[in-house]
Amino acid sequence: MSEKPVIFFDSGIGGLTVLKEARILIPELQFVYVADDAGFPYGAWEEDVLKGRILKVFTNLLKLYTPALCVIACNTASTLMISDLRQEFPHIPFVGTVPAIKSAAAQTKSGLISVLATPGTVKRAYTHELISSFANQCHVELVGSKKLATFAENYLRGYPIDYEELRHEILPCFVEKNGKYTDVIVLACTHYPFLISLFHKQALWSVNWIDPAKAIARHTRSLLLETMKNKSSKKNIKNYALFTSQNIDFVTERLLQRFNLNIMKGVDFGV
């Protein structure tokens, strides 16, 4: 591949929320979307085992591609090992996806913030450091869901989901404290924005849901300005999607077509 693509990585299809925004801002670049669906969901993995897995995926991936930049479009992976990836592959810029706690603290009026994430992101030291640095004057409720990422995968593919279960998963985000109510909820998993219309319907009261996808896309673009200087707008750029399981059903294939992604099979990720 002659192009230096921008690689987007996630455990599943959640990172498509970020890819979609990036392609709006930088359509002239080539994108490769990599989903470690064989390891999905990441939220319940033991940290050391998951670290080893992600490192192995990238070691094999970067034998195939020399990317202009890699976006870790996964909060669980980013909070776990964005520093490790930067250290292991110092010649490649990495952009992480971390809970938008700083933005939430700036927006809240009640001082009550909730972070809706996976169990892995909730327990991560990185997440707690963000709270200490940017929201130490707020009450921050950390809510780790084991089910929502899977709900999002199913919903996006057109499969039915249990709305009562979904409601049960988000209820802990709605906190009343001393007559004040949660007014900002951070979507700290890239899968969750796919469920935003359902969240609105199941919410106990109106809140501001923060989806960081646009901010990540803007940051990605800012780092690629030099790369884009010599690029002309091409109409026939081919963007690709790779899945570690190699098992892509018809529904997933049709979904990827909506995102203008061509499926590439036969890549050995070593996992």
Curated annotation (Swiss-Prot):
GO molecular function annotations of the record: glutamate racemase activity
Top-level taxon: Bacteria
Active site as annotated: C74 (proton donor/acceptor), C189 (proton donor/acceptor)
EC number(s) recorded for this UniProt protein: 5.1.1.3
UniProt pathway annotation: Cell wall biogenesis; peptidoglycan biosynthesis
Residues engaged in binding substrate: D10, S11, Y42, G43, N75, T76, T190, H191
Reaction(s) this enzyme catalyzes, per UniProt: L-glutamate = D-glutamate
GO terms of biological process kind: cell wall organization; peptidoglycan biosynthetic process; regulation of cell shape
InterPro entries associated with the record: Asp/Glu/hydantoin_racemase (IPR015942), Asp/Glu_race (IPR001920), Asp/Glu_racemase_AS_1 (IPR018187), Asp/Glu_racemase_AS_2 (IPR033134), Glu_race (IPR004391)
Keywords assigned: Cell shape, Cell wall biogenesis/degradation, Isomerase, Peptidoglycan synthesis
NCBIfam families: glut_race
Reported function: Provides the (R)-glutamate required for cell wall biosynthesis.
Family matches, as HAMAP family: Glu_racemase
Similarity annotation: Belongs to the aspartate/glutamate racemases family.
Protein name as catalogued: Glutamate racemase
